[in-house]
């Protein structure tokens, strides 16, 4: 009696082993990476969705970094301006004190010395830098904006420009990152630097002290009005930061829904594939009466 042998048995066995080996590899990759998609062939549609998701995540991360850096930058600027207001309020009080007609020349000279110190403090604050760049020089961030100048009516010279700088914090959304130094400290509606210098000159001449003090008060109000820009920008950044954080969470959840592996299931698949692979080896070796099919395949 003759035995008929399937002429395709060897190709079929090799194909079966290859398929089972692929299942083993796929389960092993899922366990190692925690992901179901480790190469495009695993899930072409899922891979396309992941690429899109990762692109949006990258852009969102960039915007989030911009927001965080800008918050630190604007908080540094606003803190400097707050210190400037404190110094100016002290100068206003000194101006009121200097208006007392009973003061001696020595007393007034002492007040002038204090005001000169405040003037120097204001210049230092106006030259505040963050991350190696100046905050109040307009777009000339590498140029020291202010310097004391005894000849200038304002008592200082300004080497910045009048440009504002905006940064994108989301698609189509930008925020102003600065108020130029001349708009803050040399505003035509009330020059803070000019008013300080004017008060110093008035006290030195013992003339017009009261008017100079009023002028300084007006300049301080104008300065405070310009400072509001920083508060508004910080509020906008806080809101955008919250939105971007929420978006990052949503994108991470979306990525997991597309790609996260069920590790328990992957481990089960690996075990099942291992058993199936070993069974195929043994069964096919028995059919071919070979001690080890792998030896044949080699």
Residue locations for each model-derived region?
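Amphipathic alpha-helical polymerization modules
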Residues: 1-142, 201-298
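Cysteine-poor, low-complexity segments in flexible/peripheral regions
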Residues: 144-205
């Amino acid at each position: 009696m003759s035995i008929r042998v399937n002429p395709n048995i060897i190709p079929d066995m090799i194909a079966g082993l290859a398929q089972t080996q692929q299942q083993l590899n796929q389960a092993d990759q899922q366990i190692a990476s925690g992901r179901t998609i480790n190469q495009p062939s695993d899930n072409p549609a899922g891979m396309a969705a992941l690429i899109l998701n990762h692109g949006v995540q990258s852009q969102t991360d960039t915007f989030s970094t911009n927001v965080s850096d800008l918050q630190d930058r604007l908080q540094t600027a606003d803190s400097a301006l707050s210190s400037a207001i404190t110094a100016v309020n002290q100068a206003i009080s000194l101006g009121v004190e200097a208006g007392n007609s009973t003061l001696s020349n020595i007393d007034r000279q002492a007040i002038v010395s204090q005001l000169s110190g405040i003037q120097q403090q204001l210049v230092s604050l106006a030259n505040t830098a963050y991350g190696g760049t100046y905050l109040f020089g307009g777009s000339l961030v590498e140029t020291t904006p202010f310097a004391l100048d005894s000849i200038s009516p304002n008592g200082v010279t300004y080497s910045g420009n009048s440009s504002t700088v905006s940064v994108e914090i989301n698609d189509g959304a930008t925020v102003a990152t600065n108020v130029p130094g001349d708009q803050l400290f040399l505003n035509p509606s009330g020059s803070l630097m000019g008013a300080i210098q004017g008060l110093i000159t008035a006290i030195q001449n013992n003339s017009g002290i009261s008017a100079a003090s009023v002028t300084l008060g007006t300049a301080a109000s104008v300065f405070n009005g310009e400072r509001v820009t920083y508060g508004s920008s910080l509020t906008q950044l806080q809101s955008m930061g919250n939105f971007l954080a929420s978006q990052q969470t949503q994108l991470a959840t979306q990525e997991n829904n597309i790609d996260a592996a069920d590790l328990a299931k992957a481990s089960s698949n690996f075990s099942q594939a291992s058993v199936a692979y070993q069974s195929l080896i043994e069964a096919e070796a028995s059919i071919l009466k070979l001690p080890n099919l792998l030896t044949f395949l080699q």
